[in-house]
Each structure stands twice: as structure tokens, then as C-alpha cells.
Amino acid sequence: MEEYEKFCEKSLARIQEASLSTESFLPAQSESISLIRFHGVAILSPLLNIEKRKEMQQEKQKALDVEARKQVNRKKALLTRVQEILDNVQVRKAPNASDFDQWEMETVYSNSEVRNLNVPATFPNSFPSHTEHSTAAKLDKIAGILPLDNEDQCKTDGIDLARDSEGFNSPKQCDSSNISHVENEAFPKTSSATPQETLISDGPFSVNEQQDLPLLAEVIPDPYVMSLQNLMKKSKEYIEREQSRRSLRGSINRIVNESHLDKEHDAVEVADCVKEKGQLTGKHCVSVIPDKPSLNKSNVLLQGASTQASSMSMPVLASFSKVDIPIRTGHPTVLESNSDFKVIPTFVTENNVIKSLTGSYAKLPSPEPSMSPKMHRRRSRTSSACHILINNPINACELSPKGKEQAMDLIIQDTDENTNVPEIMPKLPTDLAGVCSSKVYVGKNTSEVKEDVVLGKSNQVCQSSGNHLENKVTHGLVTVEGQLTSDERGAHIMNSTCAAMPKLHEPYASSQCIASPNFGTVSGLKPASMLEKNCSLQTELNKSYDVKNPSPLLMQNQNTRQQMDTPMVSCGNEQFLDNSFEKVKRRLDLDIDGLQKENCPYVITSGITEQERQHLPEKRYPKGSGFVNKNKMLGTSSKESEELLKSKMLAFEEMRKRLEEQHAQQLSLLIAEQEREQERLQKEIEEQEKMLKEKKAMTAEASELDINNAVELEWRKISDSSLLETMLSQADSLHTSNSNSSGFTNSAMQYSFVSANEAPFYLWGSSTSGLTKLSVTRPFGRAKTRWSQVFSLEIQAKFNKITAVAKGFLTRRLMQTDKLKQLRQTVKDTMEFIRSFQSEAPLKRGIVSAQDASLQERVLAQLRAALYGIHDIFFVMDAAERMSILHHDREVRKEKMLRQMDKMKSPRVALSAATQKSLDRKKYMKAAEMGMPNKKFLVKQNPSETRVLQPNQGQNAPVHRLLSRQGTPKTSVKGVVQNRQKPSQSRVPNRVPVSGVYAGKIQRKRPNVATI
């Protein structure tokens, strides 16, 4: 073929010429210049002329116009939809701004309570009325879009679920108005609360405090780009109206009779806004809500929310797998026991938000269909100041109502004796060297911690020691340093850094389950044995989830073994659950690859006011020690973690050695089995070799006169040399199937034991039919090399190519045999006859005679028989029978050639005039009788007539009698009849037994058909 550069130059020149003059295109078309060349020969000549090309261009243009119209209509529909949403927003009444000052006064309190409703754990005994709660819940949703005029206000980034009781905010409002993140989400607290100064966090990703309001419309790229400016204007107007509305409702306490199902529906569609705002972080404790499709209930939010207690609770950074969005931020306040309120509708909206965060999994069925507040109200329980930190993914047990109730019972024990908040919290810094939660949740999902539950890390992370470096936050989550300044407890700085780690299976040294000393007293009603039972149960049954997977519930990873390697801490008894060492080893065997992927986590030391990060080696903690004291774990520094890591590394070395020994043992067993199998196959090959040698004598005398014979002899040589190799390669392929070199041998194996018609060419004839043409000429002793090494992929490709070439040649050779030629001609003639018969048949049904119908049936039967014959030759017969057809065809051709050669050698004899005339007459009669069924009769008659009439030619016979005796009148009459019957007989093949009567009838019907 021509070089690519030349081809490009020619193509460019041709295109330029065509662009200069369109008239030059016509001769190019007429010359049929093709751009595709095969060995220099142009193929695929262009079939389009200028007119057809223009038509094609017109059709293309029409299609483009239709597509453009569709896009325009789609954009118009989107714009009208957005406009309708905006119009619906404008219809709402704007409340008076009279109560706006009251809102300003309550901002400080509301900032401190921003996420109190986000906490699934309940609060001390006394609850406010449902009216109080409803108002607070409404204000939580309404307060999301206030301007940040107070620098001390807590800036939170979350989801704008600002909806009043009439549900004015349509689902698309969050997208269209670009107010998807809540600037200030706070609750004007109506009940008495202890005044507290606003706490300011200096988190590295915190929102700028002087953030202007118009940034709301610029942060998120609007899906409706064409109306961006319009939407910005509308959003500003909407924000102004909402400010006055919030100020009006800040002091009103009334029950929110709001459809929770509508909230759920609206929250699902808010997902786009939320996901784009997910990278912003609040100023204070960020309680990250997990991205779970199944969080449909308020108590399921235990996995996502850091519990804000009535006492001074440290902000907790609870981050979860695949969480992109810190939903709410806030800082807890020191509340009196009667100042807490129930958590009902916000949980509904939070759950709806969580559903919206799940993306494609948002429409999965929820375990509980009801979103009624009653479900939440009956689960509301009092709790002393406790940070309930739950590492999700949640397990299947918690998705059921009973499982969730049990989870709540484990977390929220009866703490009536501990309702006095100031008495509980001072004990915690002394015991835990920090403000630690009085209860650490050891729930059913303890085994599901993504970070490979390590030496007492049973889903518990002690916030007090500042070691809550959650390593399940992915996609570059925010780092939040929440400085909490309490008016009663003093300063406790907790830098909870949530670093963006792709997949941290490592725990932190200090974040091993640090059980609070008050756990036993707080959760007095629930025995620790139940916690142990839950931990052990979930350790054995549940699975962890891969951080990189899109959905932690649906995309489960087999990381259960990593979590089940190490024991859990029973926080009530401060001891590990008893997992057998064999189970740990068995799972360590399976987790060697997973260890290589682990990143170095951070270790946050247990100091009160600082947080150290230390890189841990990429090894997990061993199964080693059985009991770990809480205070000891808090007091130990990174040295202890290093020792644990060293022991873990030693355990891994032991496991590696053990694996290597097992691997070597398995290999030795496999090799021994291979040797036995190879010996068995070698015996079979020897037997086949003997059989082939015996059969070779039968087929060795094939004729060598024909070229095709020479080709087949070549095939036999190739087959003879390759059969033994193939059989040996099969023997190896049975043992080396684990290696990559067994691809070809397996294919040879499959071919050698099936019917020979689908086998490769070098195995053709290996069946036990009489015409087997394969023989093994090489002795078996040479075949000691491993043929699986010889048959590489390259050799396999060559053998496949040779097989294809041989099969193609034999197929073409079969098509040229007389048998197949006759069958093909029969098919062609019968189909032509049937077609003509149908075209000549009367148009009206019922006129076809029985004779014509039977004739057509016989022709159809003959066509069917011919087609079946062709099918049998190519698809039913084995290779030996096909080769016998070729052999017979070669024999017939050789006989013909020999006869022709004899004729050529014999000298021609001079013929007399009478003999020449008789020969000419014979030729004429044969030409007239082509296709006639009574040809044999005519051939017999002509020589007899000439022989009888020859002596009488010179005697006194009359001329007409002489002519009659010579057959001239009969010949002329028969010629007329034959000429009349030719058209019908030409449609009938020679093998059709059609009599002259049927042919004559068809001939007589033709004028009638023509006149109709």
C-alpha cells in the first residue's frame, strides 16, 4: 500500500480541487476514483453523484434543524419552569418587619443552639411543649438565609430547607435562587436558656464572617444558566422577604402542622444545591450527616449527628463515609435541664436532606414508610451531657424499627439521676483529660467502622482527647478546628481536624475506644453484657464499606475481615470481646492486599489544649493485649502506638511466612498431581499413536498426479507433526491452567475431543471414520519438552490462521465439485420456476388446477431436498466425508482428463459426406432437444433410422418416403413442439419429472394470463 504521507497529500489535493471548482467533481465521480486502496487497487468506487450528494446534505440539514428545535424547546421548557417557580415564590405574603429586632436579640442564643435539633440523642427530663419545639424547628429552617451582620454569629453551611408551614419553598427554589447553603441557621430559643457568649471557631475552612449576601447566588453554578442574573435578582428579593418573615415568627410559638411527606419530597430535589455547597465548613463543631439512603428516621441520625447535651458538650466532628457535605455547624450551649426541647420535624427535614444527598440511591425504599413526628416523640429520652459519636455505615439491624430502638436504648440510657448537668461535666476533664462524653456509643455498627476497628476502637472516638481524626471523610473534606469556650467549664480547645484522606483504614492511637468513666453509672439500666453481645454479634456479621464506593450501603466491600481482626472494647467492662486468634489470622491472610492500600493516619494526642498529628506506619494493631485501661490509653503517647504497631508488624511477618509455606505446599501438591495426570495422558497418546500408524497404511496411497493432492499431503505433514504436540500440550494445559500459557492448549483440548468437523485443520480426520489421514511420524520419546511453553500466544495465533486458511480452501474446493454444482443449479432452477409460476398464476384464488398445484409441490420438494443436501454437506458431515467428496471429484476429473488425452492422441479419420451430414443432423437434433425428458428415446431412434435408411437411398423409393424414412418430417414436427415447449421447460430443471402434458397445459394457459 502507499505511504501514509503520500495518501494524505493526495487526499488534501483532491479536497482542495473539489473546493475550488464543483464542476471538477463530476469527472472524478465518473472515473470512480476511490480513496480506499488495497494493494494499490482502488476499491469501493463512489456511488454518489452530485444530485444524490445534494439530497444527502439536505437530509442532514433537516436532521440538524430538528435537533436544534428540540434543544430550543427544551431550554424554553426549563426557563418557563423556573419562571413558574419564581412566580410561586413571589405570590407569598411578606411578613412585617416589626419583630426583626427581637430576632437580632436572640441571635446569640440561636447561634449557640444551631445544631441542637440535629442531635438524635435526647436531653434531660423536662421537655418544653410541642409548641416550643415546633417553633424552634420552623425557625431552624427559616433562619438559613439571614445576612451575617453579626461577626460573632455562627456561620453554618448546609441545606436551605427554609420552608414555612404552607410549604412555600418549591423543590426547585434551592436550585434556582442559589441560596442552597444556609448562612445563619439558628434557633430563637423561646424557653429560658443560660446566656452564653458566642463561640468563635478558627477552623481553616470556616466561612468568612464578612461574607456578603450576594455571594449566595455566585457560589453554586446555576443549572439554568440563561436566567442567572434574573435568578440572582429574584433570590435577593426572596431573601429580603424571608428576613422579615423570620423576624415575625421569631417570637411566635405555634404548632407546625406541616406535611412531612411534602418536606421529604422537597428535600430530595434540593440535593444538587447541597452537593455543590458541601465543601464549605461551619465555624464550630461540624456534625456531618452521613450520606446514607436509609436514614429515614430521626434516631437513625445517630450515625450522623454529634449530640448536643444540656451540659457543656464539646463539639464533636462526626464524619462519615462518602460524606461530602458538612450539613450543619454550631456550638453547644450550657442549658438548664428544662431548657431543652424535643427533636421532631428537623429530623424529618434532616432525613430528607440525607435522602437528597444519596444521589441515584435517593429513591430506594425506606425501612419505615412513616415520617410522623410521633415516631420521634416516643423515642425522645433524656440524656445527660453526652457526645454520642457513631461511626457509620449503619448495619442492617439498625434499619429496622426494633434495631433502631435498641440502638437508641444503648445510647440513651435512663439518666434521671444524672440530669444535673453541672455535676456531671466537671468530672469528665479530670478523668479523661478533656471534656469527653459521658457515654460513648457502642452500637450494632461497631464492626462497620471503615478504619478497621483497632484494639479497642469499637466505633468510638473520644472527642475529649481531641483525637477524633475521622478518616472516613473523603473528597477533600474540611478541616475544622472548633474552639469551644464555655462560661462554666473553662477553655477546652478541641482541634478536631477532619483531613481529606482517600481511604484510611488505619485508626489513631488515641482514638481507640476510650470509654468514659461515667458510662457505667450513666447507663446503669443497660448491662454491659448487652453491649458486649451487640459488639460481638456485629463484629461477626456485618461488613464495612469502601470509602471510594458511591454508596456505603449498596456498594459493600469485603472489609469485614479487617474489622474483625481486632477485638472490640466493651465500654461497660473496659475489656475486649473474645475473638479467637485463628479467626484473626484467617482474616489477616485475606487482607494482605488491603494493607498495602492503607494510608498513614494521624494520631491525635490526648492533651487537653493541643492536638498532635503523628504518622503511623502502614500496619495495623495486633491482636495482642487483651485488656486496655481507659486512663492508660489516654495517658500513653505515640510510644505505645509504635509498640503496638511493631507487634502488629511481627504478626504480619508471621502471617506472610505462613502464607509462603502454604503456597509452597500447594504448589508441590499441584506439581505432583500434574505429573500423575501427564503420565496418564502419555499412555493415551501412545495408544492413539499406534492406531494412527495402523491407519496410515490405508491412506498413504493417495494419488500424487493432482495439484490438490499435493496440497492435502502438505496438510497431512503438518497434521502429523502437530498432532502429538497438540496432545502433549493438552496434557500440560490440564496442569498449567493457572498460568497464562494455557490458552491455546485449552482450545486444542476442546477441539480434539469434539466432533472432527469443528476441529482445527491439524486435527481433521482424527475421528475413527475410515478415511483418517493423520499419522504421527515422530517417536514419543522426543516429546519431553513442556509443550505448554512452546505453544505461546504467538504460535497459537499462527495455528489459528493456518486453520482458517485450510478451512477456507476446502470450503471453496467443495463448492467447485460436481455434486455441489448440481445442487446449486437445482436450487437456482427450482426457485426460478417457482417464481415464474407464481407470477403466471391467476390473480384470483381458487383457479389453480390440481395438476398445477401438485407440480408446484413437487418442485418445492425438490428445492427443499437440494437445500438440505447442501446443509448436510457443510454442517452435518464430518471432515472425513467432506474429504471423500473431494476425493471422488478428483477421480472423476482425472478420468475426464484421461479420456480427453486419449482422444487427442487418436488420429482423426476422414469422413465421407454422408457421415458428415449424419453427424450434423445429430448435432442439430441435440441442440433442439436440450432440456427434453425424452432425450434417450431420440438418441436411440436416430442411429437406427439412419442405419435402416442408408441402403435404400439409391433405390426406387419415392422421395417423400425416403424423407419420411430419414426422419426429416418427424424431426421438423418435433422441433416445432420442442420450440413451443421450450419456455416452460426452461423453468423446469432436468431432474424434474415433468411430462409434456403439463408443459403443454402451462403453454396453453399463457395467452389467457396475458389477456387477463
Curated annotation (Swiss-Prot):
Induction (UniProt): Up-regulated during the transition from G1 to S phase of the cell cycle. The highest levels are observed in S phase, after which the levels decrease markedly.
InterPro entries according to UniProt: CCP110
Region span, Disordered: 611-633, 949-992
CEP97 binding: annotated span: 1-223
Keyword Cytoplasm found: yes
Tissue specificity remark: Highly expressed in testis. Detected at intermediate levels in spleen, thymus, prostate, small intestine, colon and peripheral blood leukocytes.
Pfam short name (any one): CaM_bind
Keyword Phosphoprotein applies: yes
Modified residues (Phosphoserine): 170, 366, 372, 400, 551
PTM description: Phosphorylated by CDKs. Ubiquitinated by the SCF(CCNF) during G2 phase, leading to its degradation by the proteasome and preventing centrosome reduplication. Deubiquitinated by USP33 in S and G2/M phase, leading to stabilize CCP110 during the period which centrioles duplicate and elongate. Ubiquitinated by the EDVP complex, leading to its degradation.
Stretches with biased composition (Basic and acidic residues): 611-621
Bias (Polar residues) ranges: 978-988
Entry superkingdom: Eukaryota
One of the record's GO cellular component terms: cytosol
Chain segments carrying region Calmodulin-binding: 64-82, 781-821, 909-924
Region (Interaction with CEP76): 350-565
Subunit structure: Interacts with CALM1, CETN2, CEP76, CEP104, CEP290 and TALPID3. Interacts with CEP97. Seems to associate with discrete CETN2, CEP97 and CEP290-containing complexes. Interacts with NEURL4 and CCNF; these interactions are not mutually exclusive and both lead to CCP110 ubiquitination and proteasome-dependent degradation. Via its interaction with NEURL4, may indirectly interact with HERC2. Interacts with KIF24, leading to its recruitment to centrioles. Interacts with USP20 and USP33. Interacts with MPHOSPH9.
UniProt-recorded name of the protein: Centriolar coiled-coil protein of 110 kDa
Organism of origin: Homo sapiens (Human)
Gene name in the database record: CCP110
